[in-house]
Curated annotation (Swiss-Prot):
Residues 37-58, 119-135 are cytoplasmic. Its main location: membrane. It is found in: Vacuole membrane. The chain crosses the membrane at residues 16-36, 59-79, 98-118, 136-156. This is V-type proton ATPase subunit c'. GO terms for cellular component: fungal-type vacuole; membrane; vacuolar proton-transporting V-type ATPase, V0 domain.
């Protein structure tokens, strides 16, 4: 292979897209986790003054929101592991890592928004009707799975980008 061909497929700016994917995975998934935590926390603080014994059961949406940031962290670490200043990094790998970061980031962002809304309203209604607990948890699981789908696609993309 000639140097011209290597430079054509691995330009100097290719790692930028990998770093952007790493940043997108962490920033967007953390933003989703923060939105879910904040919106759910508002509902929890609202019921805490009336029924303090329900606070521990009401923390489920907050915990589920925190898991979203872990999904982004996993993908960001894997993408960062594929970046090296001494090895050739192709434009294909850069775009693949960018796509992986955006997949998990936006999936976790939307998942966090859904968890926040369901958590806020669900916790407030749970205070009045405790039988709603199982239904609320099921809806929260379905919202959480959206972020998991994004992480699965990001892991598949990362595997393809590593040249395996």
């Amino acid at each position: 292979m000639t140097d011209d061909l290597v430079n054509e497929y691995a330009p100097a700016f290719a790692p930028f897209f990998g770093f952007a994917g790493c940043a997108a995975a962490m920033i967007l998934s953390s933003l989703g986790a923060a939105i879910g935590t904040a919106k759910s926390g508002i509902g929890i603080s609202g019921i805490g003054t009336f029924r303090p014994e329900l606070i521990m059961k009401s923390l489920i949406p907050v915990v589920m929101s925190g898991i979203l940031a872990v999904y982004g962290l996993v993908v960001a670490v894997l993408v960062a592991g594929g970046l090296s200043p001494t090895e050739e990094y192709t434009l294909f790998n850069g775009f693949m890592h960018l796509a992986a970061g955006l997949c998990v980031g936006f999936a976790c962002l939307s998942s966090g928004y859904a968890i926040g809304i369901v958590g806020d309203v669900g916790v407030r209604k749970f205070m009045h009707q405790p039988r709603l607990f199982v239904g609320i948890v099921l809806i929260l699981i379905f919202a959480e799975v959206l972020g998991l789908y994004g992480m699965i696609i990001a892991l598949i993309l990362n595997t393809r980008g590593s040249g395996n």
